[in-house]
């Protein structure tokens, strides 16, 4: 074999040998050491080809090119006559990647970061990249206060030049803050300043926000909080001079020292606005008014800038620039604020597009828009469209993106990006209580039928005491102006005695039609007509029931077990809704008020009216809306007209998952008081507790609920982040702690006539319960679990601590 002459060795592992400036002509190229990399692929990555004249520089470029592929650990190029011999050592191939000891960082996140760096199964192992990843992960742990953490890559060789890569984590413990010192503060105590920090050196048990575990990011946020605290109180020259963070020798403790210069308090002497105001100087002037002698306030200055931007944004100036420059006068301790405004170009909307609505038709979304195509861009109108889409309840998230049109100086496209949720639900409910046992209900509801926006529902109940069926359809846009049209058909066969209610049977059917009229963005009115037929039978003689029958001109017998009565009623139905919730499902901010009522009209057998008012208010207590306080109320009242009473079967009831949890459904409130009758199979001593006056059985009280013509229910709820749930599912699961209270009463009950019996006209007989609830927007529909313990109840009340329902949320 001819003697091989070394041309150039690896740039990393050996020095270059100059062969000659004149070079030589390459007749052939051979490779040694290739295993996984194909010869053709290696040749394509080289700048040298057969027939080329090469010199030292060409060889250097060849080695660089081969190294740049990332496939080789070592590259040597030698000459054998006119043949170029390339000796390579391939990097090993990664056969598997595993992790050990990582608790703070999930495997999926690690895999994503590794893949972003080109480290994945089947690729070559780059030890330099692995070293960078080790350092990056350790830096991450240091940033969250885990200074004893270490990350080591363990590479295990395998046959055929393969390796197993294992990242071994030793996370250690988070360093806890031992002390936070603020040096230079005179106007405020250190405790007062630290009380606004997230990081604390002491955290009382009730503080769910404070944290002793050091995190670099949280410290940066706390320093900004400190700066804002002073700037908001007039200290215009406040400065954070330095911050020292020192570790204890065992790396488990942190001492933080913040050196500040407070300076003096300054007052605003005036605001001067200049620049391109786009003809809105008067409106901008209103936004920049200040009170004489008002302290300089950094937050108010920022808000003023934002308000000016929002104002201009409403008129199509999508990208205004607003810059405030404080002019400080140290002599008289005043600040003059100079505000420079550049409105920029006015933009018009070329197109409004929707993304992510795979089920919902574009027209369903487009009709909720307040921003029009071809008109100037109004930021408030774009936001209104987002709010309206959220309130539909069809989408889990709604985001907006304003995109400039390429090549156009004054046009944009507005894109609404939605993530659809399952708007259909299979409504299945189950409850269990010591007295009630197990109860069921079922139904199907689709709020966005075939993507048209129609709400279609088929609901039914079949159990020991009820057979109920209902078909409902609502078109929210019966007209282009947003007038809605809804209709309903129903049938109900109700055996009250089997439902622990007052004994009677009611077979009813009916229909109603309702029109809805939008008043403005948040208010709407409803009006409609209804018809219902009631066929009552098996009415046991009971005081409230007989009182109603007497008012209707009936004279039922207390000795007859089969009293019957039929009515046909026509009603005028009305309603009003105010809805300013931020979302249709799982809202976190805003209020909703719903008033519904009905009154009989001429041609009806009954004469009565009935009104119900529901309210709900959500108040977020953090910026991310993860901690929310919810207050709900329900008020109901009804009464007869023209000397008649409201039918007993229209009474209000309370108890159950939608009113007062922890109590069996519909069992709160007045109980039946029966008249003893003469039937041979009737035994009042067995069936009821009867009062005896002058040796006669006069009245018998029971635990059978009869409801009342008045109701009041309230609930206070504290919504919290759900433990062990990732951010991905945060919008689908909700956990809350609640306190429910409610009562039902009968304003027509005359307690003076029924001494020895509870006063069912007293509204102060309030029931209370407390517990925890979990709601989940599952593929079947909304699932609601609750466990409640009644802590204020009365004789005859029936507890049902655990309740489970599919198809109902609040």
Curated annotation (Swiss-Prot):
InterPro entries, A to Z: Bac_surfAg_D15, BamA/TamA_POTRA, D15-like, OM_assembly_BamA, POTRA
Q: Which residues cross the membrane?
A: 425-433, 436-446, 455-462, 466-475, 484-495, 505-506, 523-535, 564-577, 591-600, 609-619, 629-639, 709-718, 733-745, 768-777, 779-789, 804-808
Query: In this UniProt entry, which residues form the Extracellular topological domain(s)?
Result: 434-435, 463-465, 496-504, 536-563, 601-608, 640-708, 746-767, 790-803
Effect of altering residue 366 to E? Answer: Severely impairs cell growth, wild-type protein levels
Report the GO terms under cellular component.
Bam protein complex; cell outer membrane; membrane
Sorted alphabetically, the Gene Ontology BP terms of this entry are: cell adhesion; Gram-negative-bacterium-type cell outer membrane assembly; protein insertion into membrane
Ranges of the Periplasmic topological domain = 21-424, 447-454, 476-483, 507-522, 578-590, 620-628, 719-732, 778
Subcellular localization, as worded in the UniProt entry? Cell outer membrane
Q: Specify the signal sequence span.
A: 1-20
- Entry keyword set: Cell adhesion, Cell outer membrane, Membrane, Repeat, Signal, Transmembrane, Transmembrane beta strand
PROSITE patterns reported in the protein's UniProt record? POTRA (PS51779)
Tell me where it mainly resides.
Answer: membrane
Swapping residue 661 to A leads to an effect described as: Slow growth on solid and liquid media, less protein accumulates which is more proteinase sensitive
| Pfam families in UniProt | Omp85, POTRA
Q: What is this protein called?
A: Outer membrane protein assembly factor BamA
């Amino acid at each position: 074999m001819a003697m091989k002459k070394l041309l150039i060795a690896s740039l990393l592992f050996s020095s270059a040998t100059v062969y000659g400036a004149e070079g030589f002509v390459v007749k052939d190229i051979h490779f040694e050491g290739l295993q996984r990399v194909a010869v053709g692929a290696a040749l394509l990555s080289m700048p040298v080809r057969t027939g080329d004249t090469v010199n030292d520089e060409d060889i250097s470029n060849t080695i660089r090119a081969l190294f740049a592929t990332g496939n080789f650990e070592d590259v040597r190029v030698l000459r054998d006559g006119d043949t170029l011999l390339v000796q390579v050592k391939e990097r090993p191939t990664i056969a598997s990647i595993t992790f050990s000891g990582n608790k703070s960082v999930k495997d999926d996140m690690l895999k994503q970061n590794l893949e972003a760096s080109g480290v994945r199964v089947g690729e070559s192992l780059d030890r330099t990249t692995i070293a960078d990843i080790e350092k990056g992960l350790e830096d991450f742990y240091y940033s969250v206060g885990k200074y004893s953490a270490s990350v080591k890559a363990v590479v295990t060789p395998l046959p055929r030049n393969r390796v197993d890569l294992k990242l071994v984590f030793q996370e250690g413990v988070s360093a806890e803050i031992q002390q936070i010192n603020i040096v230079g503060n005179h106007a405020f105590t250190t405790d007062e300043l630290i009380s606004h920090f997230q990081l604390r050196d002491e955290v009382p048990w009730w503080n769910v926000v404070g944290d002793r575990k050091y995190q670099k990011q949280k410290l940066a946020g706390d320093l900004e909080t400190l700066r804002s605290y002073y700037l908001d109180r007039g200290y215009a020259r406040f400065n954070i001079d330095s911050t020292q963070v020192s570790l204890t020798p065992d790396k488990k403790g942190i001492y933080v020292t913040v050196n500040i210069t407070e300076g003096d308090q300054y007052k605003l002497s005036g605001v001067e606005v200049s620049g391109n105001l786009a003809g809105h100087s008067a409106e901008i002037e209103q936004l920049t008014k200040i009170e004489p002698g008002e302290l300089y306030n950094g937050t108010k200055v920022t808000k003023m800038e934002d308000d000016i931007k929002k104002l201009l944004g409403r008129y199509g100036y999508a990208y205004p620039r607003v810059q405030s420059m404080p002019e400080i006068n140290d002599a008289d301790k005043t600040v003059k604020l100079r505000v420079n405004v550049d409105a920029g170009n006015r933009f018009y909307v070329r197109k409004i597009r929707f993304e992510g609505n795979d089920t919902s038709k574009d027209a369903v979304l487009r009709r909720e828009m307040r921003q029009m195509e071809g008109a100037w861009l109004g930021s408030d109108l774009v936001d209104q469209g987002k709010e309206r889409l959220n309130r539909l309840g069809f989408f889990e998230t709604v985001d907006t993106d304003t995109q400039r049109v390429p090549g156009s100086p004054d046009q944009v496209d507005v894109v609404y990006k939605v993530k659809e949720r399952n708007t259909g639900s299979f409504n299945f409910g189950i409850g269990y209580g010591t007295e009630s046992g197990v109860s069921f209900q079922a139904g199907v509801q689709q709020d966005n039928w075939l993507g048209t926006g129609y709400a279609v529902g088929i609901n039914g109940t079949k159990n020991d005491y009820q057979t109920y069926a209902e078909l409902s359809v609502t078109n929210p846009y019966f007209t282009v102006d947003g007038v809605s049209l809804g209709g309903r058909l129903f049938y109900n066969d109700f055996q009250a005695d089997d439902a622990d209610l007052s004994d009677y049977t009611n077979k009813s059917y009916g229909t109603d039609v309702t029109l809805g009229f939008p008043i403005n963005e948040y208010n709407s009115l409803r009006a409609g007509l209804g018809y219902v037929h009631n066929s009552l039978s098996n009415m046991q003689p009971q005081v409230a029931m007989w009182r109603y029958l007497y008012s209707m001109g009936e004279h039922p017998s207390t000795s007859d077990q089969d009293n019957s009565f039929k009515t046909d009623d026509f009603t005028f139905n009305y309603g009003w809704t105010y809805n300013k919730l931020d979302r249709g499902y799982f809202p976190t901010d805003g209020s909703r008020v719903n008033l519904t009522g009905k009154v009989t009209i001429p041609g009806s057998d009954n004469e009565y009216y009935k009104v119900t008012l529901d309210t709900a208010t959500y108040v977020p207590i953090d910026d991310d809306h993860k901690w929310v306080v919810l207050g709900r109320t329900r008020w109901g009242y009804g009464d007869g007209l023209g000397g008649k009473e409201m039918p007993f079967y229209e009474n209000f009831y309370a108890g159950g998952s939608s009113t007062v949890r922890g109590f069996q459904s519909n069992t709160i409130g007045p109980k039946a008081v029966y008249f003893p009758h003469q039937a041979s199979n009737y035994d009042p001593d067995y069936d009821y507790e009867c009062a005896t006056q002058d040796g006669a059985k006069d009245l018998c009280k029971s635990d059978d609920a009869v409801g009342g013509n008045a109701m009041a229910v309230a609930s206070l709820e504290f919504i919290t982040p759900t433990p062990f749930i990732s951010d991905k599912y945060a919008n689908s699961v909700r956990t809350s702690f609640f306190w429910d209270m409610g009562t039902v009463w009968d304003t027509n009950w005359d307690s003076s006539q029924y001494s020895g019996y509870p006063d069912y006209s007293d509204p102060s007989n309030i029931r209370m319960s407390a517990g925890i609830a979990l709601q989940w927007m599952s593929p079947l529909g909304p699932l609601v679990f609750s466990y409640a313990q009644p802590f204020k109840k009365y004789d005859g009340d029936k507890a049902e601590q655990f309740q489970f329902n599919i198809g109902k949320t609040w």
